[in-house]
Amino acid sequence: MLRLGLCAAALLCVCQPGAVRADCWLIEGDKGYVWLAICSQNQPPYETIPQHINSTVHDLRLNENKLKAVLYSSLNRFGNLTDLNLTKNEISYIEDGAFLGQTSLQVLQLGYNRLSNLTEGMLRGMSRLQFLFVQHNLIEVVTPTAFSECPSLISIDLSSNRLSRLDGATFASLASLMVCELAGNPFNCECDLFGFLAWLVVFNNVTKNYDRLQCESPREFAGYPLLVPRPYHSLNAITVLQAKCRNGSMPARPVSHPTPYSTDAQREPDENSGFNPDEILSVEPPASSTTDASAGPAIKLHQVTFTSATLVVIIPHPYSKMYVLVQYNNSYFSDVMTLKNKKEIVTLDKLRAHTEYTFCVTSLRNSRRFNHTCLTFTTRDLVPGDLAPSTSTTTHYIMTILGCLFGMVIVLGAVYYCLRKRRMQEEKQKSVNVKKTILEMRYGADVDAGSIVHAAQKLGEPPVLPVARMSSIPSMVGEKLPASKGLEAGLDTPKVATKGNYIEVRTGAAGDSLARPEEELPEIENGQGSAAEISTIAKEVDKVNQIINNCIDALKLDSASFLGGGGGGGGGGDSDLAFECQSLPAAPAASSAATPGALERPSFLSPPYKESSHHPLQRQLSADAAVSRKTCSVSSSGSIKSAKVFSLDVPDHPTPTGLAKSDSKYIEKGSPLNSPLDRLPLVPTGSSGSSGGGGGIHHLEVKPAYHCSEHRHSFPALYYEEGADSLSQRVSFLKPLTRSKRDSTYSQLSPRHYYSGYSSSPEYSSESTHKIWERFRPYKKHHREEVYMAAGHALRKKVQFAKDEDLHDILDYWKGVSAQQKL
């Protein structure tokens, strides 16, 4: 069974011709027309020319197979062949007349085979053959008439064969021949080779590879070049044979060769190729074969570089023929230009360095080319230091881009320099403005700005204050507050109608600003820099908070004294509404036994802030402290209309007078009911009651000002009025005020809102703020310096962020505080 299976498989392989046909690649045209058939390297390789290929094929490639012979029967059906490639086969026999049917064949490649000779019968019928390649064969004999059937041959390659001799008439009939490769053959330099050497001198081989032609025998001539002498001696085969075979028979010119050269202009133009046969052995052919200028065309090399060359072409009779300058590259050529003048200067560019080029002057007639003279030269090699001319604009583009980039760098550098210089000037101006602002905050706006700067520049000389203002606070309740000062303070704070900037508004309100003692003013430009500014701002903030806290304490005590009276006071005979509030004694034990009329109001000062504490102070004292609560009632000549209870927390120990210093810190006492009573203006009535024990009962009318309805932080000056208002108007101020969005913006300006984002005094600094500063500071700072810095930022943000009427309200608030302090 196994044998039957193998036999069946073998029969299938033999009976299927499609398996072989599939190995050829066909490029077909219309109607089954085949342009190219590639059957090279077939597996299995072809041993005969395949017959399944369409007969219309033009280019047939059968290279690298195992063809043994070329027969007429295998080629006669391919009548349209123009190219036949039989390279690298095992062809050793070509039948005579095998190519009779190939009348259109132009290229025949038979290289790398086993041919031993070339005869006329092997090449018969190929009248249009132009290129014949039979290199690397075993050819020993080429008959003199082998190429007589191929008059159109342009290139013949017989290199690397076994040719020892050639007849002088072998190539004489090939008028169009331009390339004849004979290198690699073992020539026998005897007298029978002299005829071939005579033809070789006349022939202008395009490749000019004369140095590869040398003698192999006899022994005394081994290694001699056939034509070109060696550099170290002038001996070559043709000179030796010329002297040795002088009496020998010279080869007669073939009948098919044109008539001898004649200088007459009426000769047949195409009868010769421009060489005089009398000069065949007169000179050795140089590297560039040129003739006399008077005899025929000449070509000379004028200049050569590594990428260009300049040729000079001289034509005695330019109009006798059509002359063309042709460039040859091995077996191919290309026309460069048509020569129409007697002397042409041709410039050749785009050449490669260290490359050999061949240019010939050729005449054309009847579609045939006749070489007159050729020139072969080699371009120069690149030398370090020589600059090759650029054939592209790459360098130009690169230089343009680099120039643009360099220009952009210069422009950006100039812009950066200008911006940096401008920024430095702005920072310098800003520093001057900050110092000027600090000086104005310290000395007030009454002093001229120029004099302040001039005074600040004088180190060691304290500036002279134009107005000495005191911020003393009455420590005893029994003191009488002069009404004239209060009236002046009240009339001295009109609301500014026009809008202005921060400096203008604050300069206008500088008359009510607080002055610092002259001995407490440090030097401005003493090298300490920002430390002095922060310290100055912090002290100013401390002073403002001291005044605010004192005024708030006074208001709370006055409100408590008004609301604490049962009824009927010194103003009982009046029809106006009056509030009677009495102050509490210092000792909490005596508060329950003492009469309201005998209460003495303590000092305005609050308990001092202890710096050793690490937590923010609470503004409300605990209910466990010794506090006595008083109730305030509304009394009039009639019945009681309404009553509202207010609570007031009073510390159990009186505040010492000695604590009222500029660096002391004060704590506001918040009302548990968050009553706006501590922010309402107090208007004194016509008469006031008196109390014993050094205490005093103040009969005051409460009149809401227009500031109260606008901003919670507004604290206008006291208004003293002689007239009396209605009861409804006097009681309406007791209603709790609501805070609008606009009011809450500047609520930080009041010390009671100590839980805001920024503290207005160092005493309101909290632990969380301290931790934030600890997180971002690069080095450890002093605790007091951090507190002063926070205070300075708070004051700056509160005042500088205010605009227009908001700024006026802030200034009015401080004016009211100042007026209350003066009272």
Curated annotation (Swiss-Prot):
Transmembrane segments: 398-418
Membrane topology: Single-pass membrane protein
GO process annotations (BP): chemical synaptic transmission; establishment of protein localization; gene expression; synaptic membrane adhesion
Record topological domains on the Cytoplasmic side: 419-823
GO cellular component terms, A-Z: postsynaptic density membrane; synapse
Domain of life: Eukaryota
Location of the Fibronectin type-III domain: 292-379
UniProtKB keywords: Glycoprotein, Leucine-rich repeat, Membrane, Phosphoprotein, Protein phosphatase inhibitor, Repeat, Signal, Transmembrane, Transmembrane helix
Pfam families: Fn3_ELFN, LRR_8
Main location: membrane
Residue ranges of LRR repeats: 56-77, 80-101, 104-125, 128-149, 152-173
Role noted for this protein: Inhibits phosphatase activity of protein phosphatase 1 (PP1) complexes.
Complex and partners: Interacts with PPP1CA.
Protein name (database record): Protein phosphatase 1 regulatory subunit 29
Gene responsible for this protein: Elfn2
